[in-house]
Amino acid sequence: MKVNKYKVLATLVRSFFDAFSSGIIDSTVGDKADTPANRHTPKMVKQMMLDHYEHIAPVFMDTMFFPLAAMNYEYADIERVVREAQQRGDDMMALVRTACGTDAMYEGMVTEYKRNFGNLLSGRMTSNADHLEAYTRGNDAEAVLSAERAVELTVRVVMFAYARGLRQNAKGKVQLRQATLFRLMLDAMNVLLNDEAVSVDDADASDLGSLFLKVCHTQQMFTTMTDEMDRTYDELVRREGVEQ
């Protein structure tokens, strides 16, 4: 199975903003608000964006560079890309532009960044259906990525962005809130692997396996996701101050 790179790109950008903002909100409200609707009121989302406005772009670029590069280059070539950028004296923004591979992909990334940023500034978290209708589509039908790699990169963005959002208000190690992480991952897989948003309203919320299989469709995609979640969690423990 292949996924168009522009769809992957849009998923990565949306997932970053959803996860980063959720991390900030979780670190602010703790367990005082127990549902996503209560935790993501328009007023709360707007205030979060205003309080952390200057931090969003640097964290975005740091979080997104590797997934963007891995989407457009072979893993073996990424080190060369970084080395050449350092020799040119590129700043992080230029490095991210290089990671996009083409001007069209970079422009698509900027458009998605502005769209998601603007939605949050207005206090809105876009629904899966709205995202799938509005995301930036490129003209290159041949620009595709294996679904397995797309899932792996999406998992990485969700978990790193969420952890880095949690750390914005933290003084020590942070703990991932499972309910938030699973909600973020479910939404991310929904928009990545489907052309129309899959409703999970009729699914048993206590049966996570069934919920994820409904949006992932196959055991292979579900296993790819869970394996990458385990690997990324270990990396977060080592590098990002996440409690084990």
PLM-predicted stretches and their roles:
Residues 1-54, 59-61, 65-157, 162-244:
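Extended non-catalytic scaffold regions that mediate assembly and binding
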